[in-house]
Amino acid sequence: MKNRLGTWWVAILCMLLASHLSTVKARGIKHRFKWNRKVLPSSGGQITEARVAENRPGAFIKQGRKLDIDFGAEGNRYYAANYWQFPDGIYYEGCSEANVTKEMLVTSCVNATQAANQAEFSREKQDSKLHQRVLWRLIKEICSAKHCDFWLERGAALRVAVDQPAMVCLLGFVWFIVK
């Protein structure tokens, strides 16, 4: 009876590890909305033209999510106060070539992002040096998180975040079976 109860606890632990609750990086859009702001009058709600979402390489994706990235003490305070102004993703598909390495992908992603968002980089702000430093660090982190699916097929990259909970579960089950 005690052995079965232990097996159930290991199974529950494995389910929690496999759910990847700890790897979620977004924290929500808590400070994005200004609740006391008056609503501007609209133009009758009629749509006059269709707008197509721009998916050019390097385009920022801004959804108001707060990413879990360390910018240093001063940068963390600035990012926490202004995260809704920063991108939380970059549209970039750089896996068209068969022999793309991780370094090539990150470099081309950063270059495409810089070319596509010149207005954002040239924007003058009172705290522009800190803003630019946080923005560049954010771009480098987002680009370095990108990967090509064919890397996994070739076995060139090991997805530790996915494989680690599976290995812990496997070791736990083997330990209980042997015991």
Swiss-Prot record:
- Gene Ontology cellular component annotations, sorted alphabetically: external side of plasma membrane
- Which superkingdom does the taxonomy of this entry point to? Eukaryota
- Knockout consequences: Mice are born at the expected Mendelian rate and appear grossly normal and healthy. Females are fertile, but males are almost completely sterile, in spite of normal mating behavior. Two independent studies conclude that male sterility is due to impaired acrosome reaction, but describe contradictory effects on spermatogenesis, possibly due to the use of different mouse strains. Spermatogenesis is normal, with normal sperm counts, normal sperm motility, and no malformation of the sperm head or tail.
Q: Where is this region: Globular?
A: 51-155
Keywords annotated in UniProt: Amyloid, Cell membrane, Copper, Disulfide bond, Fertilization, Glycoprotein, GPI-anchor, Lipoprotein, Membrane, Metal-binding, Prion, Signal
Fetch the InterPro entries from UniProt. Answer: Doppel, Prion/Doppel_b-ribbon_dom_sf, Prion/Doppel_prot_b-ribbon_dom
Which stretches of sequence are listed as region Cu(2+) binding? 125-142
Q: List the disulfide bonds.
A: C95-C148, C109-C143
Kindly list the places in or outside the cell where this protein is found, as annotated in its UniProt entry.
Cell membrane
Q: Please identify the protein, giving its name as recorded.
A: Prion-like protein doppel
